[in-house]
């Protein structure tokens, strides 16, 4: 196994592990109607997201999202092997997609629990997998705009 493939595999595994552990803790310790205030701008909540990012497209059902996520993940794996220089960017996005696929396969929805807000303006709840995907996309766009 090449060093980049090894680092990619370890990165994906660690991100997936952190994602699944934090979701397990959210299930175990957060109630669906409760809020845990951590900081003036950060709460922990429990949300069962049957849609996509920000809860959109709930009507399409979990099976649709699993298929789309698997296709996207397959494409990203293909891109990784074409462009191993960006291994960490692909690791973030692949791990995030897999983390949410695992939720949909096990529960039929994605578990979100991070609630960022500014006073009463709340960003939709999200999770570690969503964060990994978002950071990966931002890095991908930044790197490609720099060219």
UniProtKB/Swiss-Prot annotation:
Record carries keyword Cell membrane: yes
Membrane topology (UniProt): Multi-pass membrane protein
One Gene Ontology biological process: proteolysis
Keywords from the named record: Aspartyl protease, Cell inner membrane, Cell membrane, Hydrolase, Membrane, Protease, Transmembrane, Transmembrane helix
Segments forming a coiled coil: none
GO CC term (a single one): plasma membrane
Compartments it resides in: Cell inner membrane
EC number: 3.4.23.36
Pathway of action: Protein modification; lipoprotein biosynthesis (signal peptide cleavage)
This protein's record includes keyword Transmembrane helix: yes
Pfam families xrefs: Peptidase_A8
Signal peptide span: none
TM stretches of this protein: 10-30, 34-54, 59-79, 87-107, 121-141
List of catalytic residues: 112, 130
Cited InterPro entries: Peptidase_A8
GO MF assignments: aspartic-type endopeptidase activity; endopeptidase activity
Catalytic activity field: Release of signal peptides from bacterial membrane prolipoproteins. Hydrolyzes -Xaa-Yaa-Zaa-|-(S,diacylglyceryl)Cys-, in which Xaa is hydrophobic (preferably Leu), and Yaa (Ala or Ser) and Zaa (Gly or Ala) have small, neutral side chains
Record family assignment: Belongs to the peptidase A8 family.
Function: This protein specifically catalyzes the removal of signal peptides from prolipoproteins.
Protein name: Lipoprotein signal peptidase
Species for this entry: Thermodesulfovibrio yellowstonii (strain ATCC 51303 / DSM 11347 / YP87)
Gene field: lspA
